[in-house]
């Protein structure tokens, strides 16, 4: 398969043709990768079972891993869900369009192929101009996981998508204006107590300011038990892992620095390629290996924006081991621990 790569130019006539071409591909059951404000998504018509099956095949993704349906207007909630609680509307009013995915009870039009056979559906309204225009132009709801080979770090640039999926999908829309760089937060509203199923840009505290008590599913850190179908992407299967062995080190700052330096020196002496993820304030503590700053210590958004691009770069550099300081904010720590890390080490 020859994959079309089309770059958004901000010329209205040229871009209109790109959206029309991509929309036609989606309506005919094809696959289109496109940018969102979080990461690049791999889209298909959500109500076309054969099209969604192509997503699983292209990514090498387990078919019991649910897909997120992307919509362009609030009315779609009532078509895709048979029960829209008040809390869902409050969250939509606060965070949509944006990096929020809500799990709701599904309506009869939603095929089991995108829900893992469950009675719930994951729904998101993206804010990125390309994603929003593609949904409107295509006239379909778009099921879209991240546009990467399953298990690889999520793509924040078109080049990442091309590397993973060129020749496997019909089209890639290029527009490298991904603002956030990490996945949407997924919250389950199908049960009595709202529950975060996947950490992301929106934090537990941000939710609780709008709808009250929210819990975090223990499966985020403990994993989903064998034989259980996950309610959301990322719960059962390890997502976004670099090829390198990634270790998060937390504890007293001096002990963390000592532990990382000792292990970096030891591994380099054994011939391994090693990297360190730190902060602007902590860079001076390390002088061996590939040293990468994730931003300032108190800026979780900077760390989040850099995360997947940095992991991709480590893959390109054939890094064997990565040591990361544990960031102060619970949200980013949770992202690292649940998505990418092989070990969380306390010192």
Label each PLM-derived region with a short phrase.
Residues 1-338:
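Active-site-adjacent structural elements in enzyme catalytic cores
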